């Protein structure tokens, strides 16, 4: 039976924290003019590869997102070097960066639900909002 919270999960959490610190403090690439957030890291079972999921602040522009991912890909070797100094791992995973649009999609879905609820309340009218108030005991 596999461990519920094994080594790959622990390494992935630590990598997420360390990569976020490195991106904030060490990477000075002008292509990363926007703030980068590490939303998750998936590490292979042998700890040789890691998929790093990132989001960008002000990520409305598709070209800026692609440029940011390209900059992160170009800096991945340097990031691995810094990770090797910060973490005690025999093998520092090879990093591949991916854009994580789940936050954007979550916000979009939340706005849709809010709009539907608002439209539903407008259709019902003020008299039907609280049916309990009209009842006398």
Curated annotation (Swiss-Prot):
GO terms (BP aspect): maturation of SSU-rRNA
Pfam families: RBFA
Alphabetical UniProt keywords: Cytoplasm, Ribosome biogenesis
InterPro entries recorded: KH_dom-like_a/b, RbfA, RbfA_dom_sf, Ribosome-bd_factorA_CS
GO cellular component: cytosol
Role played: One of several proteins that assist in the late maturation steps of the functional core of the 30S ribosomal subunit. Associates with free 30S ribosomal subunits (but not with 30S subunits that are part of 70S ribosomes or polysomes). Required for efficient processing of 16S rRNA. May interact with the 5'-terminal helix region of 16S rRNA.
Family of this protein: Belongs to the RbfA family.
The name this protein goes by in its record: Ribosome-binding factor A
Lineage summary: Bacteria, Pseudomonadati, Pseudomonadota, Gammaproteobacteria, Enterobacterales
